[in-house]
A protein has these predicted regions:
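N-terminal strand-loop-strand
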Residues: 1-43, 56
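Short acidic, hydrophobic short linear motifs in intrinsically disordered regions
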Residues: 146-152
């Protein structure tokens, strides 16, 4: 049996899902965390990758489990986020994915207390480093950064 002497970080996938609104604007899909760390705070849908799935499959699974949202089209890989202290549970690297869908009803499931669309100018404070991830997504998708008044 092969022995691997190097420590292994945890790997997660997070989803930045923008909802196209009827008024021509966009909203961001967030979940209220039901468990620690950051219990009760809002976060991007996402979670830990299982050994038998790809990162994109992980992103799709977590998104559907936590919000009921099943993205039919492509998920764009946004990038990896690997700050050493980004997760208090231990060394965790996330790969973020992005999609744009029509805004539709969502509901919290699995370890998410609730799921909700937030107008981009009314984002709550976000758990982990999700403010940074959202800022990268906004810049990539819309060419705009997150205004200072949003997402502490």
């Amino acid at each position: 049996m092969y022995s691997y002497k190097y420590p292994r970080p945890m790997l997660t996938a997070d989803c930045v899902v923008f909802g196209a609104r009827r008024d021509g604007g966009y909203a961001l899909l967030l979940v209220e965390r039901g468990n620690d760390p950051f219990k009760g705070m809002w976060a991007l849908p996402g979670g830990f990758m299982e050994m038998d799935e790809t990162l994109e499959a992980c992103a799709r699974r977590e998104l559907e489990e936590e919000t009921g949202c099943a993205v039919q089209g492509p998920l764009e890989e946004l990038g990896s986020f690997s700050a050493v202290d980004r997760d208090p549970r231990g060394r965790t690297v996330t790969v973020a994915f992005m999609a744009v869908v029509e805004e539709h009803p969502v509901a919290g499931g699995d370890d998410a207390r609730q799921a909700r669309w937030f107008p981009l100018d009314q984002l709550p404070p976000l758990a982990f480093d999700h403010k940074e991830i959202v800022a990268v997504a906004l810049k990539r998708k819309f060419g705009a950064a997150l205004p200072q008044s949003e997402a502490q």
